[in-house]
Amino acid sequence: MSLKNLPSESMPREKLLQRGPQSLSDAELLAIFLRTGTQGMNVIELADFLLRDFGSLRKLFSADEQSFCRHKGLGQAKYVQLQAVLEMTQRYLAETLQRGDALTSPQHTKLYLSSMLRDRHREAFYVLFLDNQNRVIKDEVMFEGTIDAASVYPREVVKRALHYNAAALILAHNHPSGVAEPSQADRRITRRLSDALGLVDIRVLDHFVVGDGEVVSFAERGWI
């Protein structure tokens, strides 16, 4: 059963228009994306089944093509559509950061870094290079693998920061375990980078650690 054939009181599109998207459940939002159900399940029932099967909306959205398309009611076209939506979301967050002050929109910064890092299966060390107005000049993954003192090279970070004529940096990396709590090694790396960058008058404004559903800020902890 499609959305248009649902009883009016059960139609998530109408609910969204009347009450706003925040009033919808995860299943209702997913139903709008799916548009139609399958034999034996209307679209709301299908959405609810998929959320239970994957475990969460985030796990559904981060599924690879094979895992996504093995479900009845989903296919390559839906997978492509979903990837386009996710990419547009990342670009929106990136544009918001690039046009504004990264420090005055910390929630956008967290959302953007989370979207870039949380679903990686390997650790990745990410850097936002900022100008003297704290606007993002460039952002990129600098190191991948096990993020420790042996794999993060302060000299390379300094070199890259000078290349972009950056005045400040925001650092970030993910914990594939899902636990965002920073380790002692994370704190040591941050101090080494801050010291090295300080020699060329470049500040480290924050270091975010991205986990599963949580992002920890060193600045908020008073560690920077």
Swiss-Prot record:
One of its GO terms (biological process) is proteolysis. SUPFAM superfamilies: JAB1/MPN domain, RuvA domain 2-like. GO terms for molecular function: metal ion binding; metallopeptidase activity. InterPro entries: MPN, RadC_JAB, RuvA_2-like, UPF0758, UPF0758_CS, UPF0758_N. A motif (JAMM motif) lies at residues 173-186. Residues 102-224 form the MPN domain. Keywords: Hydrolase, Metal-binding, Metalloprotease, Protease, Zinc. Zn(2+) binds at H173, H175, D186. The keyword Cytoplasm does not apply. Signal peptide: none annotated. It comes from the Bacteria. The keyword Metal-binding applies. Residues 1-20 are annotated as: Disordered. It holds the Pfam family UPF0758_N. Disulfide bonds: none annotated. Belongs to the UPF0758 family. NCBIfam families: PRK00024.1, radc. This is UPF0758 protein VV0285.
